[in-house]
Amino acid sequence: LLEDWEGVICTPDGHINVHETGAVAACGRTVLPTDDADGFLSPEAAERVWQFQTSCGRHMTRPGAIYISNTTESGGVWDLARFDAICDWADGHDLKIFLDGARIASGLTSPAAGGLTLEHIARRCSAFYLGGTKNGMLMGEAMVIADPKLKAAFPYVQKERCGLLAKGRLLGVQFETAFAQPADGGEALYWQLARSANNCALKLRDGMVELGFEPYRHSDSNQQFFTVSAAQQQAFEAVCN
């Protein structure tokens, strides 16, 4: 997605900025975080990064792509309007769009999705992936290269970065099964699992609220976070340890 001199714009809590052990830097690329505080990459914050990074021309890392995730790191769900707004901004700056879809099934089956669909994501993103391990599978994600210009190079990048498995078909079988159309014409297993996970998470949230726990933020996905006191934290740690 990026040339050597380019970087990727993301939120401060974006997975590639926090939880990938410097993997992007190890590949010779730069992460350019915004000042967004809610996990959603906004056009306004992305524009500030763009203006700063392009203010000195060739002397600074130039943005070449944006990174978003659905759901976000804290369980936020992208709806159609918010998604189109950041994609419109990226298109206006000729930037590639990558969506981290580790929890895409949860996001798209959430009541907060607001009309966003997998087909629409495929039309707007340069590349994205379909989460497997966070939706009932043993391992793996399915990378979708939507931009035709990127497809020819991807197999070589996959091999170079040790992403080609000798028995890789075993990963594909999971997705083939998960997306198979049921004989009764119902919803594919991939989406059934996500809806079930969301429903269970919302039941858990309601139960935690009844017990007096305060949600860290509102979330209609299978990610639920709560604020706890120091004493409660110690009690949880004692059980976990």
Regions found by a protein language model. Give the residues of each.
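Conserved PLP-enzyme active-site core in the AAT-like
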Residues: 1-241
